[in-house]
């Protein structure tokens, strides 16, 4: 009986070793399937300046004050002030005409990587931290699902008639973009030495502490810029910088993005006409 059991056990061991050897041979014979070339994800290449300049521009509107003004106000101030009723009419007209607001990340992706945009894109920007941009402008925009970019002059935060830190945080948390606009609105063309730290770095750091998000976009006070400013702005990680209606720089189009001021004298028809005529097709 013992001999029979030993013989059976020996047979089992031989069979196990044979199967294991066969399985190992099968594993060795398996050749991985070749990776198809069209499934290899390649790194996107960035468009050069010439390519960016050829792209159709997105209309970008620039607002400052949203408040009534008297008949005796100067022509200059009329360029920076829009009646609340006029602003409301402009937002409704944009919505009724099929426009969709976009944000700077979308604009950057479109310009640099040929990313998609809605059929009728528009960008709404607000300069200088005025409180009514939050209490009137943002409220009106929310009716239509619109989002905006708020360029914050940090010296004004928490001052009368300007936004508080809490309001800025609320705008950011609700899907709008908070961006840089210097500390005290001095022209970047006049900066020297420590000015770059005071006007660019510290405001960027403060706004990041308020929003909890990177500050990646910037607007030049008065729309004025020079090559030194572009270099300093790029060195601080800004992806786009916005001017006003002057031509884009042929070598740095991402840092000379054009906008048009919306003056208090415009009708909605005038706004649409300016959007059509001010940006390339």
Language model features: what each stretch is:
Residues 124-125, 178:
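Residue-level marker for buried hydrophobic side chains located in beta-strands
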Residues 64, 181, 185:
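Histidine-centered divalent metal-coordination motifs
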Residues 161-168, 195-199:
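Charged helix-capping and loop-helix junction motifs
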Residues 23-124, 131-132, 190-281:
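C-terminal active-site subregion of NodB/CE4 polysaccharide deacetylases
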Residues 16-18:
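C-terminal motif of bacterial Sec signal peptides marking the signal peptidase cleavage site
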Residues 151, 181, 241-243:
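Short beta-strand and adjacent tight-turn residues that come in two discontinuous sequence segments
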Residues 138-146, 163-180:
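Acidic (Asp/Glu)-rich catalytic clusters
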Residues 6-14:
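Sec-dependent N-terminal signal peptides
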